[in-house]
Amino acid sequence: MDRIVLSTLVHRDPETVFETVRDFRTYPNYAPVLDAVSADGDGGIGTRYDLDFSWWKLTYTARSEVTAIDAPERLAWRLREDVDAAGEWRIEPAPDAAPPDVETASRLFFDVAYDPHTADPNAISLPRFVSLDRVIGLVRPRLYDEAEKVVRRLVADIEGETRDVELTVHEQPGS
């Protein structure tokens, strides 16, 4: 099982941060490989999201489901099929960590665990003569880079401007 855990300080209160991470439909703004998100549900526990990805010569729809919500501290999800993966966003109040010119802050955690070797080879339309093992080898190192980009872009969206976001890496594949 591989795991990515990143955190950063967001210059907003936990409620504001939570409302942004809760809205999966905005995620294509944060991940260029994510083309579209469709929802079946009201955003609560049990809501299912189809996330349409395209990268290189591959297209894939990840079918996810919200498994837990403890607003404004936590939102958990899992993939329903094709690969063993689950994750969560955690938000902790961090007002004492706010810079002097910022009213308050929160620490945002992105935490995902996945087993790339559980991927269903029939779920992805692979180009001719390309093996699933090769695709896993190509995608695996990119997942961490994409997670960093998503968190940075999410912070810019929450705060309304781009800034140099310091990420703390708690765990990454190979660590």
Segment roles from a protein language model:
Residues 1-44, 173-175:
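Hydrophobic ligand-binding cavity/cleft-lining segments
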Residues 3-5, 59-63, 84-88:
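Short, surface-exposed coil-to-beta transition loops
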Residues 16-21, 27, 49-51, 66, ...:
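Hydrophobic pocket/interface hotspot
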Residues 40, 67-69, 90-96:
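Short beta-strand micro-motifs enriched in acidic
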Residues 42-50, 69-77:
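Short, hydrophobic/aromatic-rich segments at coil-to-beta transitions
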Residues 79-148, 156, 165-167:
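Beta-strand/loop substructures that line and gate deep hydrophobic ligand-binding cavities in soluble
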Residues 163-175:
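Charge-rich (especially acidic), low-complexity segments
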